Amino acid sequence: MSLQQVSMADLQRLAEASADVLDQVRDAMMAPHPLKTAPTFTSVSIAELCGIDKSQVKYLTQKHNLPAGRKIEGSKAKEYTLEDAMTWVKALGTYPARPEGKPGKVISVCNYKGGVAKTSTAVALAQALTLRGLKVLMIDCDGQGTATQLCGISPEREVDVEQTLMPFIHGDQPDLQYAVQPTYWHNLSVIPASSGLLAAEFALPAKAMRQRGFKFWEVLKDGIEPLRTQFDVIVIDTSPSLSHLTVNAMIAADGLVMPCPPDALDFASSVQFWGIFSELVESLPDAKLKCYDFVTIIYTKVRGNDIARLVKTWMKQAYGTHVNGIEIPESTAAQMASAQIKTIYDLSKPDGSVEAYRRYKEPLDRLADYVLDQLALAWDALPKTASAQSGLFDAAVVQA
């Protein structure tokens, strides 16, 4: 065996070739459509979404002049578009809505470690909230751009750095409205990311050194502020690290969601994450006064073995009521959706085992319901003229 030497030019060619392969894979997954398309719904799924019996669909269609769906060729069944489904939800008032005059809420999905289903959970949560009648903005704060990819946009092929957070971070834009893009999913917009966003980890500390009094941790909060009147919920996907942008996302948030597998190393990493964040907050002026409407930790990639059960008891002891008991299983349904650059909500019908599909989707539905309940409580607690700022929360509480 001879020594294999790899030059920087070789790595450049490797990067270009791998990017080409990824584009080909993405195009193949989207075929025959060049762009990602929204799912369709059956009468049964419309009924489930609205919390009614299927037998009521025909009656309510006529009574409220709701979308009747279209006949599927060669079948008696009907299918409904995503927009049809949202019209039904809004018309029947199935879920709580943002009260008039109150600001939209920001939720950051965070973890110190990769491979914990953080991004897929964040995008699925954003989609599920739209299915509950809310207008949602997804902000991708990870230079890898996986959330952007799941929103139907190729981060390297279709996103220029000027379309990311970077112009605002550099001070070239007054807020983040310039970066908001529509997606294939009705009522879901995105501020995309690409590898150019990695420059934020140099730009923010450099700006802090140049400008006395510059609060690098509040940049994202300031940029989001005007968007709170335009969106009911803003979901932020963070990088798997406690980077400058992740700190910004956590300071900007009203609620935090941490996906964490019940695995010893993942649990240890989560403890380290909260410890470092709490120490950092203590060193930042005003940040220690930060308050969250909720902080919740959910089990992800759960296996039904003794080790997982043991680690779940550790997590409950460590985090107490912040662990809400939702368990998203390790599932072939998730793997099959991911292989198509999709979330479970992108599928019009189960791709494979119906039972695996339901086992995976049900806890994600419960997560969306839990988050929406927390948002409703937070909105109710706000006076109508309240600012969009959070109240008081000691970050160290999550270490209890």
Role assignments for model-derived ranges:
Residues 1-49, 54-400:
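P-loop NTP-binding core
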